[in-house]
Amino acid sequence: EEFGLRGGLKYAEIAVKENEQHIAAIESDASGYVPRGFGFSGSDEQLNKIQDWLKYFDKNTISYFSKGGGGADIGPLHRQTGTPMFGLSIDGQKYFEMHHTAKDVFELVHARELELGTASLASLVYLIDKYGL
């Protein structure tokens, strides 16, 4: 996204050209802080269905699926193909203390917070696979 969305635009272009079928697109680009929920862009029917998945998540991490979400990198695919998209939402209170600063290095990422985000994303993929959208 930092370079004019070129990667996302090219990916969508190739996906359309090759008639690739996507079940969902998922983006995590808000940092590695504690996950809080997911934003979702798709149909209202799909959103109602995935709201029921909250029971599978610890409410202290993933507590919502909100309408509208995804990310800049997967937006072109969503717009060109209608692929539903998810964006991981995090507790961003400290986001600008590190984002694009000298402290914005992997070594300073809190390992446990990153693990919680990874587990949340893996759980989402599992639920999409098991129950579909």
For the regions a protein language model found, what residue spans apply to each?
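Acidic/histidine-rich catalytic neighborhood of metal-dependent amide-processing enzymes
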Residues: 1-50, 73-74
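Active-site-adjacent substrate-binding region
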Residues: 33-133
